[in-house]
Amino acid sequence: MEKSNPVLSDIYNSIWVELKKGATQRKHPFHLCFFSTISLSEEKTEPETRIVILRDVDKETLTIRTNTDLRSDKVSQIKMSPITTMLFYDKEKKIQLRIKAESKLVSSKKEVEQTWNEAQEISKRCYYVPFPPKTKLEKPFSNESLDLDNENLGLNVFGLIRSKLLEIDYLNLNYTGHVRCKFELEKKGFIKSYWVVP
């Protein structure tokens, strides 16, 4: 790791504090983030972005975890192209985080089951929809159509995505002058940090 700049180190540490709050506080602006993957096909290659809920953050391993329906496109997209991006924005503090990561599906059944058992019932209901995401319907889907007794749903379509952070691009908007910096990450911390023109 390079010799750290005290100001950059403070920013880096503050990023992890806010991300942790985002994972544990529902009303924190970082609780939701834009998660982008690459859709690869013979016809075209294009990005796909959706909002996901930040579920867990680990500064020691430089990872972020979100939950997913195993039938969603992002699961197959990550398997084909694991490099993903995440965008967070705090409107009050005017802080934007753009994160580049390497994402993968968690393979540990024990961890998946434990996370499922700890989830709230209202969250579990999302995984009892009888159709995969993006399925065409004749009318809007109703929660009354949930198949709560179907053993092939619920836990069987519930998955975890763990993303290993590779880069963090920090931007603080300020009328006296925007502040932007980047952190390149490896193993347990940043190896390069530098100021960037906003």
Where are these regions (language model features)?
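Binding-site signature for planar aromatic cofactors or substrates
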Residues: 1-198
